[in-house]
UniProtKB/Swiss-Prot annotation:
Reactions accelerated catalytically: a ribonucleoside 5'-triphosphate + H2O = a ribonucleoside 5'-diphosphate + phosphate + H(+); a ribonucleoside 5'-diphosphate + H2O = a ribonucleoside 5'-phosphate + phosphate + H(+)
Pfam families per the UniProt record, alphabetical: DUF402
Active site: R23
Cofactor dependence: Mg(2+)
Positions contributing to Mg(2+) 2 binding: D105, D107, D120, E123
Keyword Metal-binding assigned: yes
Membership in a protein family: Belongs to the Ntdp family.
Function: Has nucleoside phosphatase activity towards nucleoside triphosphates and nucleoside diphosphates.
NCBIfam families linked to this entry: PRK13662.1
A GO molecular-function annotation: nucleoside diphosphate phosphatase activity
HAMAP family: Ntdp
InterPro entries found in the cross-reference section: DUF402, FomD-like_sf, Ntdp-like, SA1684
Record's protein name: Nucleoside triphosphate/diphosphate phosphatase
Length: 196
């Protein structure tokens, strides 16, 4: 399938290794595409969980997906700064329905103060056994977790200081009907968010 264009809206679907739909984000605006990368923004979007529960996200988020990397990143714009949620996951595929990937349970959360925390190791161990993750997948995910920590420490890709500002501003340019900006009039908050 052809890559979406900037300004297009796509759905994002997260699956588990056994093929069940884990989570669906209804509207994500694409703000950048490259051969292997999609960057999008969702802002108060409808999210549907695997059990049918629905909720609306509280804050804007910049999402980063790569066709060759075994992780994706969500940068959440919060009043106290940017928090990152990095999912260890399969590279994405794209079809007419949605951008899709397999969520492999492990996550690394980066708090606005820079603290990093590995999440859901118990869920990973349980699902690895239950769904028979191969040694190859286990090895890929282990090496990817170190690669991801390097990206975080080196402020690479979605963890770069200006990443959030650049792509959130692009989102606002593509949505001229909105008379608001997360950064507008919030210079002190902006400095805090960007770590400057």
């Amino acid at each position: 399938m052809e890559m979406p264009r900037e300004g297009d809206y796509i759905a994002i679907q997260s699956y588990k290794h056994n093929g069940t739909l884990h989570r669906n984000w209804r509207d994500t605006m694409v703000v950048k595409t490259e051969q292997n990368i999609i960057i999008g923004v969702n802002d108060r979007t409808l999210i549907t969980e695997e059990d049918g529960r629905k909720w609306i996200s509280r804050e804007p988020a910049i999402v980063y997906f790569h066709r060759k990397l075994w992780f994706n990143v969500i940068a959440m714009l919060r009043p106290d700064g940017v928090a990152y949620y990095a999912n260890l996951a399969s590279p994405f595929i794209l079809d007419r329905e949605a951008l899709k990937y397999i969520d492999y349970d492990l996550d690394i959360k980066v708090f606005p103060d820079g603290e990093k925390r590995l999440l859901d190791a118990d869920e990973y161990a349980m699902n690895k056994k239950r769904w028979h993750y191969s040694e190859e997948i286990d090895s890929i995910l282990r090496s990817t977790s170190f690669e991801l920590l390097d990206w975080i420490d080196q402020k690479k890709g979605p963890f770069a200081r200006k990443f959030v500002q650049i792509w959130y501003e692009r989102y606002n340019q593509l949505r001229p009907d909105l008379d608001r900006s997360f950064f507008k009039g919030r210079e002190n908050e902006e400095r805090k968010i960007l770590g400057t």
